[in-house]
A protein has these predicted regions:
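N-terminal periplasmic "start-of-domain" segments of outer-membrane beta-barrel proteins
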Residues: 65-95, 125
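Extracytoplasmic beta-strand/coil segments of soluble accessory domains associated
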Residues: 103, 107-143
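C-terminal beta-signal and adjacent terminal beta-strands/loops
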Residues: 512-513, 561, 613-620, 628, ...
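Short acidic/polar hinge/loop motifs at secondary-structure boundaries
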Residues: 144-171
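Short strand-turn segments of transmembrane beta-barrel domains in outer membranes
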Residues: 186, 191-220, 230, 245-249, ...
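Flexible loop and strand-edge segments within Gram-negative outer membrane beta-barrel domains
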Residues: 235-242, 246-252, 266-345
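Gram-negative outer-membrane beta-barrel transporters
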Residues: 412-418, 508-510, 532-621, 676-680
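Outer-membrane beta-barrel signature, preferentially recognizing the C-terminal barrel domain
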Residues: 286-309, 341-343, 400, 431, ...
Length: 683
């Protein structure tokens, strides 16, 4: 890559060995002078070589993960430096999991609730720590790709799971980092580009007419890298409507291009992606039709840069997202009854940070314009816009602009990290002035392997266009909704070694003006769902997890490579009102248990077994009766042969063939089996 790092290099002279397990790794990118070693010292070193070889890879991987920069603050911090709890799903975890979509993969993250109305991510609501799908920020390479129309479309990722390097999950309010949609946290998906020119192809098939095929090609030429990928997925689905027709079928195509330039003074990255999906919606949005249908299309473009000054860094980015949606409450019954919507989001981020002896200081601004034109959402338009390919117009719309300014300072000492900042934000929609949302994170290393942390953070969320204007088919929106606000306290402890990693955290969230859809069942079946602001909603939660990497203790040939188990508990203290049914705010996972293990059966033959138990609080109505969600257990597994250039796999979800519901009246599929292969080669 021919990078000139002379300005940032420093000399290190080894005079003696230490017990620090990462001493050699920490010398990378530094000029190293080897001091004189006596013969007795060399003899002692030689005796330790054999034992060290069994755990070098585990230590190196742990150090590598600790030094990954994550987006939990405005200035870049590594996992080991971050004062907040940031969960990282690395490439190995992604490859081993019995999952074919990002949505399915996130089910195994303990603080994340994935509620599916369809299979393999056909329609998915993702939330964090008991929040709703509208209360998190979804990012792709650090770019906010949330759809202001509705969080139902937030998981329309224009990139295939095979192109992902890692997924970062930041739990808890992140207003000072991500702005006006990160009320309960953020999920950042980071893609990868091959380091050398090459290509890969994959194909798989399975139950219910499932097929997925795709691949990518990359070209590396000096300082430039370019990679293009694409995939196609389809299935007949697992259910039928009363007339016997398909109502959970889907097909989706994705295309993604990414490139970068690595210069001496600046790095530049650029992206473009598209996702096109059609899927049967069963009874997703109402029980009076069991043959609903939806079409979505998402466009994504972004350009990012970062200067390479020794002390000052400038990180601008500009992006444009477009989302298109067509909803058919009665599938194929005439375009005049369909709902059409198109959102456009244009954003500019200007982030700066300065490194001094006092720490890292970040400051900057963000401008984000969100607009919608629709047949149902918004105010009447003076000049309607023609809908492409249809003899109808977008005759309603709304536009709002959010501007924010942030300031954050981080102090990093050998055993202590403190990060504090504030964001000032203003939106043209509410007509109010700037509001300030502060936050502070602190951590202290008690011993080499023990760290405690605590945080106080605040955030807000503007109502989605659906919450403001969706009035039809049993729904009545309120365009005068207020923005949600959140305060959160969190504390925890971490124990991190190459062989054992454990965390325990406790948090308390205090929310005001929380938005929800509620319905009063005492007023009869015709009473609509109404969007409202709850006065307040308090949440208390506990999360605990432990991972054992047995390769550190017995070497890479260990039969049980690793085992991890996690538990989450949530309690909301707002009492349920008689006859009032909540769609989202008062429906949450009270208990969640996740356990996973990776086994090395023989040579390159590996097995992943994943277990989940979930107990959800909430009610739904069916046939005029109020029903409570029942807890359920799911068991998934993946068997794979992992060679250098190819991989063969077979996997199954819901092996026990359980009947369960994530959303009322929408059953989830039973056992689902898939098998496939991947082949990689270099040019």
């Amino acid at each position: 890559m021919n990078e000139n790092n002379q300005k940032s290099s420093r000399s290190v002279r080894f005079r003696r060995f230490t017990n620090c397990p990462y001493a050699v790794f920490r010398s990378l990118k530094n000029q190293v002078n080897i001091g004189v070693l006596t013969i007795p010292m060399l003899a002692v070193a030689n005796l330790n070589v054999a034992s060290a070889q069994t755990d070098n890879q585990a230590k190196e991987k742990m150090y590598e993960m600790e030094e990954v920069e994550v987006t939990g603050s405005r200035a870049p911090l590594t996992v080991s430096q971050a004062a907040r709890l940031v969960t990282v799903l690395d490439r190995e975890a992604i490859a081993n999991a019995p999952a074919q979509s990002v949505n399915d993969l996130l089910k195994y993250a303990i603080g994340v609730d994935v509620r599916q109305r369809g299979n393999l991510g056909a329609q998915t609501d993702i939330s964090i720590r008991g929040g709703s799908f509208d209360q998190i920020t979804i990012l792709l390479n650090g770019i906010n790709i949330c759809d202001p129309q509705t969080g139902h479309n937030a998981a329309e990722f224009p990139v295939d799971i095979t192109e992902i390097e890692r997924i970062e999950i930041l739990e808890g309010p992140a207003g000072r980092v991500y702005g006006t949609s990160s009320l309960m946290g953020a999920i950042n998906i980071v893609t990868r580009i091959d380091k050398q020119s090459g290509a890969a192809v994959h194909a798989e098939g399975g139950s219910y007419g499932y097929f997925n095929g795709g691949g990518h090609a990359s070209v590396v030429n000096g300082r430039f890298s370019n990679q293009v990928s694409g995939s196609y997925t389809r299935s007949d689905g697992f259910s039928r409507n009363k007339a016997g027709g398909l109502n959970a079928d889907f097909k989706q195509s994705k295309g993604f291009y990414q490139g970068n330039y690595r210069g001496d003074q600046v790095d530049v990255k650029w992206y473009a992606g598209i996702s096109n999906k059609d899927f049967g919606s069963n009874t997703f949005y109402g029980v009076s039709s069991d043959d609903q249908f939806e079409h979505t299309r998402k466009f994504y473009t972004a350009v990012q840069a970062e200067t390479k000054g020794q002390n000052y860094h400038f990180k601008p980015s500009v992006y444009w997202n477009r989302g298109e949606d067509r909803f058919e409450y009665f599938r194929g019954k005439g375009e005049n009854t369909y709902n059409y919507g198109r959102t456009d989001v244009l954003g500019l981020n200007l982030n700066n940070y300065v490194e001094t002896v006092l720490g890292k200081t970040a400051f900057g601004a963000e401008f984000r314009n969100e607009g919608i034109i629709s047949t149902k959402l918004g105010e009447p338009l003076d000049n309607p816009t023609k809908i492409h390919g249809v003899d109808r117009d977008y005759d309603k719309g709304l536009n709002r602009t959010n501007m924010s300014f942030h300031l954050e300072h981080t102090v990093i000492l050998p055993r202590f990290t403190l990060s504090a900042g504030v964001i000032a934000t203003k939106n043209t929609w509410d007509g109010e002035g700037f509001k300030f949302y502060p936050g502070v994170d602190v951590s202290y290393q008690l011993a080499r392997d023990w760290k405690i942390y605590a945080s106080y953070n605040t955030s807000l969320r503007l109502p989605s266009f659906t919450e403001l204007y969706y009035t039809m088919q049993g729904y009545k929106a309120d365009k005068h909704l207020k923005a949600e606000k959140m305060q959160a306290f969190e504390g925890g402890i971490k124990y991190l070694t190459p062989g054992v990693k454990a965390t325990v955290s406790v948090y308390r969230n205090h929310g005001t003006n929380m938005i929800d859809w509620i319905r009063d069942t005492s007023k009869g079946e015709d009473e609509p769902w109404q969007s409202v602001n709850h006065t307040k909603l308090n949440t208390t939660g506990v999360e605990a997890s432990v991972l054992f990497d047995f390769r550190h203790f017995v070497g890479q040939s260990a039969f049980v490579k690793d085992f991890n188990v996690s538990y989450s508990y949530i309690d909301k203290d707002k009492e349920s009102e008689p006859n009032i049914v909540s769609q989202y705010a008062l429906e949450y996972l009270k208990h969640k248990v996740v356990a996973q293990t990776n086994l090395r059966l023989y040579s390159k033959l590996n097995l992943n077994v994943s277990y989940r138990w979930q107990d959800r609080i909430g009610n739904y109505t069916t046939d005029g009766k109020t029903m409570s969600y029942k807890p359920y257990t799911l068991l998934d597994a993946r068997l794979s042969w992992d060679a250098k250039q190819y991989r063969l796999f077979a996997e199954a979800n819901n092996i026990l063939n359980k009947t369960y519901y994530d959303h009322g009246n929408v059953p989830q599929p039973g056992i689902w089996v898939r098998a496939g292969a991947t082949y990689r080669f270099n040019f």
